[in-house]
């Protein structure tokens, strides 16, 4: 018997085996543990890059969107309310929150640090970006540059 996550991965693999030009995935990481989510998103990115495929990812997980998407289309009550590059969409955090979405947690951290005057750099949308932006800043503050 396959677990829910295994069934999801098998279904996605079956669709990918057909080598579609456009791959539409609806909440592909729902129910997956963090490692399974990371592996699946990496495979989706690799497939997209290697096969020059358009991937439409439907998700409530802004962390997933930040990690794999170049653009985001945000809908509310069946209407398109935003369609832009990830950085521009996530820069509208208050609007996203009003419709029940949020920016990635790491982006909220950057915003809060900026509000408190502790950070002046760019917002990060992934943990990897945050590490690249914040670690040098923190080292300078501690005098360990």
Model segments located where?
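H-loop/switch region of ABC-family ATPase nucleotide-binding domains
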Residues: 59-60
């Amino acid at each position: 018997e396959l677990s829910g996550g295994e069934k999801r991965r098998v279904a996605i693999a079956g669709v990918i085996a057909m080598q579609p030009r456009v791959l539409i995935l609806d909440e592909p990481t729902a129910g997956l543990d963090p490692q399974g989510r990371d592996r699946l998103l990496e495979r989706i990115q690799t497939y997209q890059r290697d096969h020059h495929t358009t991937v439409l990812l439907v998700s409530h997980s802004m962390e997933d969107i930040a990690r794999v998407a170049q653009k985001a289309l945000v809908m509310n009550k069946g209407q398109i309310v935003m369609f832009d590059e990830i950085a521009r969409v996530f820069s509208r955090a208050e609007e996203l929150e009003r419709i029940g979405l949020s920016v990635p947690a790491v982006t909220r951290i950057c915003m809060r640090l900026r509000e408190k005057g502790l950070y002046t750099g760019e917002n990060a949308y992934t943990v990897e970006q945050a590490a690249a932006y914040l670690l040098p800043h923190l080292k300078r503050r501690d005098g360990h540059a």
